[in-house]
Each structure stands twice: as C-alpha cells, then as structure tokens.
Amino acid sequence: MTTRRDFIRQATLLGAGLSMSPFFINATPGSVGANDKIRVGLIGCKGMGFSDLQAFLRNPEVECIALCDIDDEVLNSRAAETQKITGKKVKNLYKDWRKLIDNKDIDVVIVGTPDHWHCLQMVAACEAGKDVYCEKPLGNSIEECNIMVRAAEKYNRVVQVGQWQRSDPHWQDAMAFVHSGQLGKIRTVRVFSYQGWCPSIPVKPDEPVPAGIDYDMWLGPAPKRPFNRNRFHFTFRWFWDYAGGLMTDWGVHLLDYALYGMNVTAPNSIMASGGKFGYPDDACETPDLLQTIYTFDDFTVMWDHAIGIDDGAYGRNHGLGFVGENGTLVVDRSGWEVIPEKVSGKARMEAVPLKKAYGEGGLNLHVKNHLECIKSRNRNCNASIEIGAHIAKFSQLGNIAYRTGKKLTWDGKSFHDTEADKYLCKEYRAPWELPKI
C-alpha cells in the first residue's frame, strides 16, 4: 500500500516578479568540476520542491544559496528549515524568481512550482546557463514540452525531470524482466491509480488575497481569476488552468513505466471516458474517475484512476500490470511480482514471488544521478528532458481525449481535429508570452 510519503504533492508557490519581461540576456553556460561545490537555488518552496531540495542537501557537494517563493510565510519558514539542515543561513531569499535565475553564483535551479509555471522558469534557467531539476509533469501543454526540449538542447543544459521512479532499483529490476521476453507477447498494459485518501474539495467563496502573497504572480501566465483557496496550494492540480488532474500527477509517474516497458513514446489513437462521479458537486474541474485507452500497433495501454476509492487491481491501489501470453508482471512502489498465465490448469511460466522495494529511496538516487550527470556533462539523465516530455505529452493526450469526448488519432504533431488541436498549446495571459525557441 502507498504511504503518506507518496502523496507529498502540495502545491508549490512561485517566485513573484518585478520586471514584466520573463527572460534574460543569455548567460555563458557554466560548468561544474568533479570536485566543485554545486550551488543550488529553489523556486517554489511549499511542497515537493522542498523535498527535492532536501534530497540535494543529502549530498556533501551541494550548497543551497537561494530560495524563492511568493508567500512570505512559506519563504521564511523554509529558510529556517534549510538553515537547521545545513547549519548555514541561506544567502539569498527572493520573491522574484527571475532574480534567482539571474544570480550568477547559482549552478542548478530546482523548479518546484505548479505545472503552469514550469515552461517559463525552466526555459529561462537554461537560457541563463543553469542546469535544471524540474518537477513533473514537465509542461502543462504539448507545445510547452516541445519548447522545453528545444531549450535544453539549444543551451546544452543537463535537465532531470522529477520522475524519480526512473532511479528506483526495484522498478529497474521489473523493467529488466519485462524486457527479457519471459512474459511472452504483451497484449496490454494496465495502469491504475486509486487514491482513497484524497477527499472531496468543498466549494468555497472567493476572498481577498491573504497578506504576504503575491497572487498575481502566482497566476502568472494563467487566466486572471479572484483568489480562491481551492485553486491554491495542493489543490491547484484539480483545475485545468494550472494542471491536468490525477492524469498528469500520478499518471506521469505510472504511465511513464508503460512507455519504458514497451519501448514506445506515442500511441496511434486515444479515447477516454469518465467524469466527476465520486464527488459530483465539489469544486474540482478535473475528473475524479477516468479510463483511457491508448492504442498502438499491436497492444494497448489502459489508464484507470479513481479518487475516493482505494482498491484498484491486483490487490493494490496503484501500479502497472504487463499482461503477457505467459504471465503478468505487476509492479508498484512496494515491489513487483509475476503471476503465471494458466492453460487447462497448467502454468505457462514460473511465478515470481513479491520482490520488495529496496535501497535508499528513488528520490535520493534520482538526485544523485542528476549530480553525476552535471559533473560529467552527460545530458542523458535517468529522467532526461526527452523522457519527461514524452510522458507529459502522453498524459496530455489522454486528457484531451476526455475533454473532447472523441476517439482521436495522433501523428506526433496534430490530431487533425480542430477541437482537439486547440488544446495543444495554452494561451498565456499578458504580459507573459510562450517562449520562442
């Protein structure tokens, strides 16, 4: 079963801005020697961003020299926590994320903000000569992901996306078994996330912006709306302006392994069905129940999520089942096993009993992998920018099929459907502009 640790998905707040131009004069790309200190700055300190920073600080070569958040209370409390961890006062505290990126002493920027900010901040960091650890999902639209890949390539930056399961050894062991061919031909991959812990979000009235929060900069490129606590902090992910619901949250982690296991990046067609069936009257916009079928040449990937229900498939509340002719490999964050297929009572292969998760934890290993790649200037991280883009776009395809209610075909660039194609790119609120790379 998934522990509360797995659900650290609180909304991460943003750096506030003074200048209205989001980009910078190109910086000379920096390099970090094998024995050099690696100086990091974090944008978005509330939730997963701070967990990422803590993982960085477990490595002796890392020094945190800057924090940025639009919420004074969050910024000051995280600065105190960081000082307690390191024994040193954080040198620079910002409410303007662009000032952090413009700090020439910073080698690595951690982007821990809500999804709708990832593209602007990651591209600006690359342009300024920083390497980047960007939380998942990589982008909030398909076009944003394409732009981010081009930026990392253009500025030759080492980017790791926060899909830390890519560095978790038991997941890698499971994929090695899938790739061994012992399961036989795989006909479908069942991917599921049932989150019974997640409650209904009651409708709340709009209210004045709390003191110490720059809400206009929290919105950034998203549409202008009155302040509402339901659209802020952790629950931002249930609103289309800022994120894509459980599909782009847990879906990015789990569907990523469907792509990895099957050695694919994009489907031929997608269809989806679902809705707000568990909590029909709550404040959320994204579906609390969704089934999506991605069709490839000779197999399917099926996504199934439900909020407020904890019993999924194979006795688990999340995971994947690679369904082969000889057996099914089931994997989740607790471990993996193989269930044989039986014909006339005879097993087609030997069962593999549960192989439990092991090691120091995927997030710690993921950050170590990033640091090693930074030192060696190897852009092929465990969750490289390309890997992050593939799965972020894959998840977006499912959401677009749901929102249009259509079976869609996909050629890698377009649906060739006017209604569906309008979802390929987000419209940015002025004065923010989609980066041109």
Predicted regions: what is each one?
Residues 71-74, 94, 114-118, 138-140, ...:
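Short, solvent-exposed turn/loop segments enriched in Gly/Ser/Thr/Pro and often Arg
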Residues 69, 88, 112-116, 139-143, ...:
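Alpha-helix capping and helix-loop boundary segments enriched in small/acidic/polar residues
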Residues 33-35, 102-103, 127, 152-154, ...:
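Extracellular/periplasmic catalytic domains that process cell-envelope and extracellular macromolecules
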Residues 173, 185, 190-192, 196-238, ...:
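Contiguous beta-strand/loop segments that form the cofactor/metal-binding neighborhood of enzyme cores
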Residues 1-134, 143-158:
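N-terminal glycine-/serine-/threonine-rich beta1-alpha1-beta2 phosphate-ribose binding loop
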Residues 40-43, 64-68, 110-112, 133-134, ...:
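Structural recognition of the beta-strand scaffold that forms the well-ordered cores
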Residues 131-133, 139-212:
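A contiguous active-site-proximal alpha/beta segment in oxidoreductase catalytic domains
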Residues 57, 101, 152, 178, ...:
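Hydrophobic residues in alpha-helical segments
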